[in-house]
Amino acid sequence: MFDPITIASTFYIRGFRAPGNYIQGRGVLSYLGKLVKRYGRKALVLSDSDVRRIVGGVVEESLRRFGVEYVYVIFNRECSWEEINRVTKIALENSVDMVIGVGGGKTMDTAKAVAIPNELAAVMVPTIASTDAPTSAVSVIYTEPYPGEFVEAINFHRNPDMVVVDTEVIAKAPARFLACGMGDAASHYWETRAVFQANKPGYVFMDYENRRGVEPLKPFDLPLHIAKLLWETLQKHGVAAMHAAKLKIVTPSLEQIVYANTLLSGLAFENGGTSLAHAIGNSLSVLEKKMKPLQYHGEMVAFGTLVEILAEGGLEYAVEFIKWAHSIGLPVTFEELGLRDVTDEDLYKVAEKVKATSEYQRLAYEISSDQIVAMMKVANEIGKKYGQLYPRAPYE
């Protein structure tokens, strides 16, 4: 017998999207020039000054060795319209064939926003495994200056042409970034299920207008299976990968988590859709200036995931998530998010932002600002209660 989702799918046009190439391995960055020369003879390389100091030499030597000219642009830390316009001007003035984004999610989102609308090849080289930005056709835009507030998420008509992940580079990054990637990735198991149950689309579209996808296509059931594999991989390898990251070494578990954080997570969210966890995670950015220390995307989404689990899955699943999250160091309370003096006014700011997100539109139910605030407060109390039973591991 066919399940209801399969039967319903006969009435829809469905779609699936993915990056053109995904390449991962220890030391692969030294082959970057060989890999990208298929896209042309001249590149714009975008990274911040710290990343250039760490891996810029390997990137530049590889491009020179394989005959790829390049102009190196230092990223200004925030993926904003101001920064996108600045880098686009440099790319067009130099007649480059490709944009190579080297660094974290904001760098790569900026590189995509420069390359894809201008029909340049987009090559993503993550130096941390903290988000699924490398594989997706989405850029998240923030205000200036850094750290900015969330403005919008824009959709592109194609995914990056290539993603090159050097696990030796990933292993040398602070272990916190790996945990953040897992925090982002774990949300997709719950969000994909919620989106399917609501019969809503993901981020695959028939057409694109004004940086927006229009005529969304319904997903196949593949994202559900990817999200399940993703969550199982995080549970099986997360703790061991964190130990490897703390020691700055590449192990099979670290390879599996990098693959999960980057490829599996990207395929799951883009084809399966995002929901309440990301609505809350993104909206918590309105409180970033109060957070001490500043929290990363995956940390805020981890708290959002706890809220979604309590709203849709119940206490048993919430406790399982808290235990796992604390085992790798992720926050599950306001205090762990660096919000030691959070007020109702603060939470209502978050709630109003939640209701303005595209993720909110994918919910199977309507929730008021009062309900969103109440859900966050409940998640905080549950996080405090059960977090004591499963102490939070340090990142380093």
What are these regions (language model features)?
Residues 29, 52-56, 81-84, 106-113, ...:
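Short glycine/serine/threonine-rich phosphate/pyrophosphate-binding segments
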Residues 205-207, 211-330:
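Active-site segments that bind and position negatively charged phosphate/pyrophosphate groups
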Residues 2-8, 314-396:
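C-terminal charged capping/lid subdomain of soluble metabolic enzymes
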Residues 91-129:
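A short, small-residue-rich loop immediately preceding and capping a beta-strand
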Residues 1-98, 334:
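ATP/NTP phosphate-donor binding region
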Residues 37, 64, 68, 92, ...:
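Generic secondary-structure signature for well-ordered alpha-helical cores
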Residues 20, 116-219:
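A glycine/threonine-rich phosphate-anchoring loop and its flanking beta-alpha core
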